[in-house]
Amino acid sequence: MFDIVTLARIQFAMTTVFHFFFVPFSIGLALVVAIMETMYVVKKEERYRKMAKFWGNIFLLSFAVGVVTGIIQEFQFGMNWSDYSRFVGDIFGAPLAVEALLAFFLESTFLGLWIFTWDKMNPKVHVTFIWLVVFGSMMSAFWILVANSFMQHPVGYVINNGRAEMVDFVAVISNPKVWYEFSHVIMGAFTLGGMAVAGMAAFQLLKKRDISFHKASMRIGLWVTLFGSIGVLLAGD
């Protein structure tokens, strides 16, 4: 039979893997939706508005599942790895708190405004909301990766009374590892979001459904995929 540590690892691994199905997809899809709505504002073509709303609904579902699984994961830091949390919590908790109080609330606030103000705000103002959601999602990723980079390359801390204590917050957020991780994760997310949209649109084109709508969706998805793929190549080199 499995021991307690192995069971904790299995549970945490399952939560993390499931959570990370939705995080990069949400980040990448947010960019695609923002580009679609920007095209609507610039070109005044109704199909781009419909595209932004359609793919935006899929983004909302992914975002919601990502939030729920992320909350479960944070509970497991304390429940599955309580000794580790006690040892490194002074450092590990800081970026997670900043992510929740700054990036997540920014993202959630403007996502709510974006959802409920389609016919109430000037289109140029409304498109700003989704771009702020994109920015907020990237900021969330950054602060999570600050915590992760500390685990890979600990900096800015001292051991005091058997606990790791932060002595240099700037060193923690400027950890060289975080910038490699951030660029690689974000570009990978853009690749995933673009490819998912392009793939689903291509399937609909094969079914001869709403040709103009899905052809434009696939085109934008492929451009985002190209951009993300080049970024992943450069970041992972």
Regions found by a protein language model. Give the residues of each.
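Polytopic transmembrane helical bundles with strong interfacial aromatic enrichment
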Residues: 1-237
